Design a protein with these regions (language model features):
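Cytosolic-facing regulatory segments adjacent to core modules
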Residues: 4-93, 107
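N-terminal cationic and glycine-rich segments that engage phosphates or anionic surfaces
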Residues: 1
Length: 195
């Protein structure tokens, strides 16, 4: 999604990767771009005909206005500041901000984590409004999903979710039946649940 916004609309995209390093995320993006497994890219075990594809993919991604910040424990204020700086450098509004993932963000007070997440989601909503940019904040699910017969996620499954559903304009949840049932006839199908 982030790559498409940068590529198709030529708008700067800011990705805050709190879980993965910049290098890991770049390998994933490159893997998607060229259709070669990320592990093979990392090890360099490519077929002769794949090397030119790799070069083209690196060139394509290198031209995109994408910024990846992989500093752990970032907070809303740091993210807002970085987004403003990126907008000033690029001379235009951002096309998208992606945060991977919400529960790894640092709060500004020692309150309980649910209250902290509530402050963070309100801050992200304010940042989106102030900078006029869509913000996609990925979130973890609680382990409760695993104990149910029907594993499709619900709003109540969002970890520390007190305010996520309240502050979000839209919550999308992803479900792949083959993850839980390898023999399912729905192999290769991903459901997007809109709540």
């Amino acid at each position: 999604l982030a790559k498409n916004v940068a590529q198709l609309h030529n708008l700067p995209v800011c990705i805050f990767s709190l879980e993965m390093s910049k290098e890991q995320l770049t390998y994933r993006l490159l893997s998607m771009e060229v259709g070669i497994e990320a592990g093979r890219l990392r090890t360099g075990r490519l077929q002769q005909e794949e090397w030119p594809l790799l070069g083209q993919g690196i060139n394509t991604l290198g031209q995109l206005p994408m910024y990846i910040d992989d500093k752990p424990n970032s907070g809303v204020l740091e993210m807002r500041s970085l987004c403003r700086r990126l907008m000033a450098e690029q001379g235009k509004e951002l096309g998208l901000v992606v945060i991977d993932y919400l529960q790894l963000m640092e709060g500004s007070s020692p309150d309980n984590r649910v209250q902290e997440i509530s402050r963070i989601t309100r801050g992200l909503k304010g940042m989106a409004r102030e900078l006029n940019v869509p913000v996609i904040a990925l979130s973890q699910l609680s382990r409760g999903v695993e104990s149910r017969t029907n594993k499709r996620p619900m709003l109540s499954d969002l970890r520390e979710s007190g305010s996520i559903e309240q502050d979000a304009d839209l919550v999308l949840m992803i479900y792949r039946d083959e993850y839980y049932n390898p023999e399912t006839p729905d192999r290769g199908i991903t459901e997007v649940i809109v709540t």
